[in-house]
Curated annotation (Swiss-Prot):
Expression sites (tissue/organ): Exclusively expressed in AWB chemosensory amphid neurons.
Gene Ontology annotations for the cellular component aspect, listed alphabetically: axon; dendrite; endoplasmic reticulum membrane; perikaryon
Signal peptide (UniProt feature, chain positions): 1-23
A Pfam family assignment: Rdx
Protein name: Thioredoxin reductase-like selenoprotein T homolog selt-1.2
Organism: Caenorhabditis elegans
Deletion consequences: Viable with normal development, anatomy, motility, lifespan and brood size. Double knockouts with selt-1.1 are also viable with no visible phenotype.
Gene designation per UniProt: selt-1.2
């Protein structure tokens, strides 16, 4: 059980790490469920949308003006699953402003939460190693062989998986900020933390339009 359990856990970790990196490298894509959510958030007092009256579609900014556009930055909560939301807003902005430089990244949690999340991650790996290898570090500091550790050694696979899941839960909770903060140049034009919701497509594009009018 010890050898086979170690192999299974090792494969489980490798698969988890692979999924994380693969998720980060996914190209922008549409998500119908997110689109439904954004549509449901539309307020009746939303900022008027800039629309081409003849074709009833949004105007595209002339490429000659694109070089003067400030950089659009979107900082979002990765652990909250907002990567897909960023991809969708990226497409919204690129469709209207082809020359707009857009950057996205994780909105870091408070310093102490980030440090605590790292400590939890290290502790998680250490506990899993102790369970899988069957070692007893408590013996070296005079605490003998705790009953819970004995039980974990007899059920290595299930206890390793339990530690992994609980550790991930605490790490995710500490790392989550719920943020989706949008900046145009050095000006913040939207904050999900303060407004407690993601902007609609119309609000997003109109906020960019209004901000550009102030700098032209």
């Amino acid at each position: 059980m010890s050898r086979s359990g170690a192999i299974i856990i090792g494969l489980f970790f490798i698969a988890s790490i692979f999924d994380v990196f693969r998720a980060e490298k996914e190209p922008p894509a549409e998500d119908s469920r997110l689109e439904d959510y954004l549509s449901s958030e539309l307020e009746t007092t939303a900022i008027p949308t800039v629309v081409n009256e003849n074709s009833h579609s949004q105007d595209v900014v002339d490429s000659g003006f694109s070089k003067d556009l400030p950089k659009l930055t979107i900082l979002y909560c990765v652990s909250c699953g907002y990567k897909q939301a960023f991809n969708q807003f990226y497409e919204f902005a690129k469709e209207k402003y082809p020359g707009l430089v857009i950057e996205g990244g994780n909105f870091s949690p408070d310093f102490w939460k980030g440090c605590l999340a790292q400590i939890v991650g290290v502790a998680k790996i250490g506990l899993i190693a102790i369970v899988i290898t069957g070692s007893n570090p408590f013996e070296y500091i005079g605490f003998g062989y705790p009953q819970i550790l004995q039980t974990a050694h007899y059920n290595r696979f299930s206890y390793s998986l339990l530690v992994f899941m609980i550790g991930n839960l605490f790490e995710s909770t500490l790392s989550s900020t719920g943020a989706f903060e949008i900046f145009l140049g050095d000006k913040q034009i939207w904050s999900k933390i303060s407004k407690e919701r993601v902007p609609t497509q119309e609000e997003f594009l109109n906020l960019i339009d209004l901000q550009l009018k102030t700098i032209r």
